[in-house]
């Protein structure tokens, strides 16, 4: 049914200074490259971001490039959802990177708990350049790997789509989409909707 095991949606907008780091982190993933597609969706960038995307796509088959008129991050992610051909869909902002085994670990966890869960989240380690910052407050709640109920008030604030959630691809026309009317917190609403 699905062509790939994992689809990564990367909204791209005026990010030429850090886009290569993001894309290089995807090339280092331990998941098999034939199980991976990366949708680079340019949202009307005015800098060289689209050119960088095209360069990577020419050299590496995992990258697929799309160019849209500026519509905002939610519309860009929705376009990605509609074009994703992976069993699982994850999101990565163009100024973020993943550790090398992230996608394989997430896909394996989903495989083991497929019937129990709708969404997988994983740790964010904030850096600015080489400087590491304190962990996000949510890690006071998420102390171990496991299955958490997001309807439980204790755990309802642990997700965001910037770079640390993965969802099941339910197939054409069945996936939850982002609310394009929201200027912020669209990711939190999306997670609750999932």
Predicted regions mapped to residue ranges:
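Flexible acidic/His/Gly-enriched loops in nucleotide-sugar-dependent glycosyltransferase catalytic domains
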Residues: 104-177
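Cell-envelope/extracellular polymer assembly enzymes that use nucleotide-activated donors
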Residues: 4-7, 37, 189
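Short, well-formed alpha-helical segments that are part of the catalytic scaffolds
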Residues: 15-29
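Short aromatic/hydrophobic "clamp" motif used to bind/position activated sugar donors
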Residues: 89
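Acidic donor-binding/catalytic loop of UDP-sugar-dependent glycosyltransferases
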Residues: 48, 96-109
């Amino acid at each position: 049914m699905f062509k790939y095991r994992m689809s990564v949606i990367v909204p791209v907008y005026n990010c030429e200074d850090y886009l290569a780091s993001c894309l290089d982190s995807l090339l280092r993933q331990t998941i098999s490259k034939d199980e991976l597609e990366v949708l680079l969706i340019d949202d009307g960038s005015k800098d060289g971001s689209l050119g960088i995307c095209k360069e990577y796509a020419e050299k590496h088959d995992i990258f697929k490039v799309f160019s849209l008129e500026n519509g905002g991050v939610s519309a860009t992610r929705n376009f990605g959802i509609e074009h994703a051909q992976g069993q699982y869909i994850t999101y990565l902002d163009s100024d973020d990177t993943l550790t090398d085994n992230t996608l394989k670990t997430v896909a394996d966890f989903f495989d083991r708990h497929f019937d129990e869960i709708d969404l997988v989240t994983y740790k964010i380690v904030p850096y600015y350049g080489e400087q590491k910052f304190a962990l996000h407050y949510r890690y006071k709640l998420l102390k171990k790997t496991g299955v958490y109920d997001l309807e439980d008030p204790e755990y309802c604030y642990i997700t965001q789509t910037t770079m640390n959630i993965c969802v099941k691809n339910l197939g054409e026309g069945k996936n939850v989409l982002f609310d394009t009317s929201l200027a912020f917190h669209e990711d939190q609403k999306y997670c609750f909707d999932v």
